[in-house]
A protein has these predicted regions:
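Blade-level signature of beta-propeller repeat domains, shared across WD40, Kelch, NHL, RCC1
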Residues: 240-246, 251-266, 270-274
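Entry beta-strands of beta-propeller and related beta-repeat scaffolds
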Residues: 25-27, 75-78, 119-122, 175-178, ...
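Loop/turn-rich, solvent-exposed surfaces of beta-rich toroidal or solenoidal domains
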Residues: 164-207, 213-215
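Short, conserved, GDST-rich strand-edge loop motifs in beta-rich repeat architectures
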Residues: 181-189, 246-255, 541-569
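Short glycine/acidic-enriched loop and turn motifs that connect beta-strands
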Residues: 33-36, 85, 129-131, 183-187, ...
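Extracellular glycan-recognition regions
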Residues: 249, 267-476
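Surface loop/turn signatures of beta-propeller and other carbohydrate-active proteins
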Residues: 1-21, 34, 47-71, 97-115, ...
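Beta-propeller blade signature
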Residues: 43-44, 88-93, 193-202, 258-266, ...
Length: 610
């Protein structure tokens, strides 16, 4: 049965995907940057369900990124850039052991390996450059040569830079296909893209595809921003796919997720994406995803965890289901952090914490040394970070043994603590963490959940939990209805336990006054919808039919009623909330969207659905 695409195969921070097939098995890895141990290898048999296998680079090598994972003859390789040069590791078994990194002593980023028809090996890097490799692939021969200039996209496109990078190569029907990224990895929502070129020779000359860009975000209203860094993969049935990364709209904080789309080959020998395809049937069922919750049974750290800018397994001790982590530094900026990747727009995480004398520990959301938020304690006071530069203090009346809980709901963070994990005290709420991402702090990282230990001695962590916090239907307790009244043109709400008998909220007065949100100082026809992310979406007509009577307008309608008819408004009010209290608003004017809508008669009674 055909399914529609694109689809997310790994939500959260899984950027720069590199994918390969070995018979019926598919393997994939991503950029680890400063997270160590690095290069988490994933395994699948249907391209949709992935299980984590191992981490292959335990030692810390600096910011490693944009790898190329492949198998040549009987050996697996990972080529990657770090510390101003390119490296390679190899293994006979995908699960290891893997070799120590070998310095290729060649600059550039985003390496892409290819073998020509004579068996010669080459390595492409960014800027359209290529260099010959030795037969074993562990050294280079000669100098880099520029062989490709990229694809000239329209000048008016809003991008970050030309940034020709991510060269990945495949051979198909007598051609070599060079798949590259352009436009910049972050920056504007429309920055990134995937482009294609082909050649009869592995070193060019390259002819650009008439279907470029293959993948691109065309508008900031698209569901996925900065789509790019694509790699082609064929499945066991001979179908082809493209895997790439992208930011979820409005969620740079989550990092770049890994997505997949099917492609088709045209009669003239090019490829392009299609919206539907039949997925692969696996030989064995694979449980998808990485379990983030942890009871710290030991004796080794789970695959969900990484250190930041170090690899310090000797700092960890497992004892009686408690992870003891040796402290260092004084604050989250220089302390020891253990991080895991958040996957959801709305999630909750908690952990039981024990601090020692002179020790500070906590639960935080961590981007880098200059961007983090959460709660830490020395047993005497709680320190709540809204960001690295904004810290408040509250008395700790619980002591050195406490529970901490963070709820990140649409980039709005609440912080709670508890003595027993049952009754919670809110220390802070509605803290905005939406700015803690690459476009403000650089680095291409993500806002990850972190365990933090600083000062002296060790901090103890147990019963770590992470869960998607979108409410389940069985946890809901009432029906909500929204409506308007002609006498006040405001938004009213009512609730019901059974869906039949409703009680008005706010003593029957408007919950939101129309003159505070609408251009015409009144709203009508409200519709509310709860999205799959758990947020509430409101849509309303921007219209006050008695605006002249109530002194908001000198005329009966905004325009001549004889020519444009009753009401003749051209606006809607769109709002979003996670808690029905704090709302974001957009005032939509159709005549401002397009000249085609400038003479629209009346826009009213909208309905939102997903």
């Amino acid at each position: 049965k055909k399914k529609t695409y694109p689809k997310v195969i790994l939500p959260g921070d899984y950027p720069d995907p590199s994918i390969m097939r070995d018979g019926k098995d598919y393997y994939m890895t991503h950029s680890p940057f400063y997270y160590a141990p690095g290069f988490l290898i994933w395994h699948s048999q249907d391209l949709m369900n992935w299980e984590p296998l191992c981490r292959v680079m335990p030692q810390y090598e600096g910011s490693a990124m944009a790898p190329d994972l492949l198998k040549y003859k009987d050996t697996y390789y990972i080529y990657y850039p770090a510390a101003g040069t390119n490296w390679v590791m190899w293994a006979k078994d995908i699960r290891g052991p893997w070799s120590l990194p070998v310095d290729l002593k060649v600059g550039g980023i985003d390496p892409g390996h290819v073998v020509d028809r004579e068996g010669n090996r080459y390595l492409y890097v960014d800027k359209g450059e290529v260099i010959r490799l030795t037969e074993d692939g562990l050294a280079t021969v000669g100098e880099k040569k520029k062989v490709y200039d990229g694809w000239k996209y329209p000048d008016h496109w809003d991008t970050e830079c030309m940034c020709l990078e991510s060269p990945k190569l495949n051979e198909h029907n007598g051609y070599y296909y060079l798949t590259s990224a352009q436009g910049g990895t972050a920056g504007p929502a429309t920055s990134h893209m995937v482009v294609s070129a082909r050649s009869k020779s592995v070193t060019g000359p390259w002819e650009n595809s008439p279907y470029n860009p293959i993948v691109h975000t065309y508008s900031a209203t698209d569901s996925w921003w900065s789509k790019g860094h694509g790699t082609l993969i064929d499945d066991v049935n001979g179908n082809w796919w493209i895997v790439y990364h992208a930011y979820a709209n409005g969620y740079h904080t989550l990092g770049r997720s890994t997505l997949i789309e099917p492609i088709e080959w045209t009669e003239d020998g090019w490829y392009r994406t299609v919206s539907a395809a039949t997925p692969v049937t696996p030989e064995q069922e694979i449980k998808h995803g990485l379990e983030l919750s942890d009871d710290f049974k030991g004796p080794q750290l789970g695959l969900q965890w990484t250190f930041w800018k170090e690899y310090a397994p000797k700092s960890l001790t497992f004892k009686e289901d408690i992870l003891w982590m040796k402290a260092k530094g004084r604050t989250p900026a220089d302390g020891r952090v253990l991080l895991t990747t958040a996957e959801d727009k709305n999630y909750e995480t908690q952990v039981e914490i024990r601090t020692g004398n002179g020790n500070v520990a906590g639960l935080i959301l961590y981007y880098n040394e200059k961007a983090y938020a959460g709660v830490v304690s020395d047993g005497k006071r709680f320190y709540i970070y809204r960001n690295a530069e904004h810290k408040t203090e509250l008395p700790n009346r619980i002591g050195k043994h406490f529970f901490a809980r963070l709820h990140n709901c649409g980039n709005r963070l609440s912080v709670e603590v508890s003595k027993d994990g049952e009754e919670w005290t809110v220390l802070a709420s509605d803290m905005d963490v939406s700015s803690l991402h690459h476009n403000n702090y650089g680095g291409f990282y993500a806002l990850r959940v972190g365990l933090f230990s600083a000062g002296k001695g060790s901090s103890g962590f147990s019963r770590f939990r992470y869960r998607n916090a979108v409410p389940r239907e069985k946890d809901m307790s009432a029906y909500l209805m929204v409506f308007h009244k002609d006498e006040d043109h405001g938004l009213h709400m009512a609730i019901s336990p059974d869906g039949y008998t409703f009680t008005a909220l706010n003593e029957g007065k408007p919950v939101i006054a129309g003159d505070t949100i609408a251009e015409q100082k009144g709203i009508r026809d409200p519709h509310i919808f709860r999205g799959p992310d758990g947020a509430f979406y409101l849509s309303m007509t921007d219209l006050h039919i008695y605006a002249q009577r109530d002194g908001y307008r000198d005329t009966e309608w905004e325009r001549d009623g004889k020519e444009y008819g009753w009401g003749n408004n051209r606006g809607l009010v769109l709002m979003k909330s996670w808690d029905l209290i704090h709302w974001k608003r957009t005032n939509l004017r159709f005549d401002k969207l397009s000249a085609a809508y400038s003479e629209v008669g009346c826009a009213w009674a909208p309905e939102v659905f997903f």
